[in-house]
Amino acid sequence: MSIASDKLVKECEEKMVKTIEAVKEKFTAIRAGRANVSMLDGIKVENYGSEVPLNQIGTVSAPEARLLVIDPWDKTLISKIEKAILAANIGMTPNNDGRVIRLVLPELTADRRKEYVKLAKNEAENGKIAIRNIRKDINNHLKKLEKDKENPISEDELKKEETNVQTLTDKYVKEIDDLLAKKEKEITTI
């Protein structure tokens, strides 16, 4: 067993895990029918001359299925938070009562749900492509190791490691499929 080939297979798994995390992050950004505090993650608010993430200047909660509440720690920032939400164009209009900001999620139409499912499928496919590209790169590195003059690996070891890489590929592609099925159900559930 070659240390170099083991290292490549470990590197392969690490990259695939990072790809899965990226797909999960993309899925979080796709809105389902329920309010989720992560829907506001990308919003930055101007605070004392710098852009600060919304979740760092107040508490963001989802007390109901279609309601987000932002409770800023500094109440003087309410108008700036409102402006940032409107500028982010997230499809919600902020309601300000002077203490907190409420965001009511509009009901998703059937067409909008289909769009979100399509978007989720696209992100899942991009994740699978990334996983397969990682497999291809690692297999190419393994083949170079087989031809290495100083420290070659045997043909049997090459086949064994390629099988390990394929097993990892299958595992993570299935995980993406499972994540997609879960996200589709979340989007289509009314």
Swiss-Prot record:
Cytoplasm among keywords: yes
Database matches in Pfam families: RRF (PF01765)
A single GO BP: translation
Main localization, broad class: cytoplasm
SUPFAM superfamilies (UniProt xref): Ribosome recycling factor, RRF (SSF55194)
Location of the protein in the cell: Cytoplasm
Entry GO CC: cytoplasm
GO molecular function: ribosomal large subunit binding
InterPro entries (alphabetical): Ribosome_recyc_fac, Ribosome_recyc_fac_dom, RRF_sf
Keyword Mitochondrion included in the entry's annotation: no
UniProt keywords, alphabetically: Cytoplasm, Protein biosynthesis
Family listed: Belongs to the RRF family.
Protein purpose: Responsible for the release of ribosomes from messenger RNA at the termination of protein biosynthesis. May increase the efficiency of translation by recycling ribosomes from one round of translation to another.
Protein name, entry field: Ribosome-recycling factor
Encoding gene (name): frr
